[in-house]
């Protein structure tokens, strides 16, 4: 949401004055360093986790393939989300934390750009597609895996400033 009226009342930015969907015009915005980090969690059976950890999944390197899928997805966000701007991203990093006590894999993506619009959707798309890829690679042994906890952890740059999950309360 942005503030579209003089009183500063929140409004959805992807709609014009008639309520029609519209891509936001960012041409007047200053180019600044934009960074966003998102996360997702894939929960699974302990046996599935052990196979991922040991590299025993028949399809191959689960985390390596999921990392590449997440990076590719971040670069293709504008093709997937209708009103996102196509962006020349500076950096996309996709990392994994193995959580044996849960058992789960936590996925984190950080996207960087010097530009006129944020990269939150690119980071969220990266973790989403990385999670879907992990599911695809492992579904032969565990169709009961769950994907959840997809959220923005941090964003900085631009007019709206810095956001950190948990700071909004």
Curated annotation (Swiss-Prot):
Pathway membership, UniProt: Cofactor biosynthesis; molybdopterin biosynthesis
Keywords: Lyase, Molybdenum cofactor biosynthesis
Signal peptide: none
Active site: 136
One GO MF term: cyclic pyranopterin monophosphate synthase activity
Record GO biological process: Mo-molybdopterin cofactor biosynthetic process
Enzyme Commission number: 4.6.1.17
Alphabetized InterPro entries for the sequence: MoaC, MoaC_bact/euk, MoaC_sf, MoCo_biosynth_MoaA/MoaC, Mopterin_CF_biosynth-C_dom
Lyase listed as a keyword: yes
Catalytic activity: (8S)-3',8-cyclo-7,8-dihydroguanosine 5'-triphosphate = cyclic pyranopterin phosphate + diphosphate
Enzyme class, first EC level, given as a word: lyase
CDD domains in UniProt: MoaC_PE
Gene3D superfamilies: Molybdopterin cofactor biosynthesis C (MoaC) domain
Keyword Lyase in record: yes
Residue sites binding substrate per the record: 83-85, 121-122
Family: Belongs to the MoaC family.
Function: Catalyzes the conversion of (8S)-3',8-cyclo-7,8-dihydroguanosine 5'-triphosphate to cyclic pyranopterin monophosphate (cPMP).
Binding partners and assembly: Homohexamer; trimer of dimers.
Name by which UniProt lists this protein: Cyclic pyranopterin monophosphate synthase
UniProt organism field: Rhodospirillum centenum (strain ATCC 51521 / SW)
Lineage: Bacteria, Pseudomonadati, Pseudomonadota, Alphaproteobacteria, Rhodospirillales
Gene: moaC
């Amino acid at each position: 949401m942005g503030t579209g009226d003089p009183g500063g009342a929140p409004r959805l930015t992807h709609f014009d004055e008639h309520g029609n969907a519209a891509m936001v015009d960012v041409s007047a915005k200053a180019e600044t360093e934009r960074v966003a980090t998102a996360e997702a969690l894939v929960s699974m059976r302990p046996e599935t986790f052990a196979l991922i950890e040991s590299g025993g999944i028949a399809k191959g390197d689960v985390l390596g393939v999921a990392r590449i899928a997440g990076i590719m997805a971040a670069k293709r966000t504008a093709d997937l989300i209708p009103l996102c701007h196509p962006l020349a991203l500076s950096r996309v990093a996709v990392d994994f934390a193995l959580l044996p006590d849960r058992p789960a894999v936590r996925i984190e993506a950080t996207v960087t750009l010097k530009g006129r619009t944020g990269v939150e959707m690119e980071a969220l798309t990266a973790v989403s597609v990385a999670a879907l890829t992990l599911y695809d690679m492992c579904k032969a042994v565990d169709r009961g895996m769950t994907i959840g906890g997809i959220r923005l952890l941090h964003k900085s740059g631009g007019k709206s400033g810095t956001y950190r999950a948990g700071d909004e309360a």
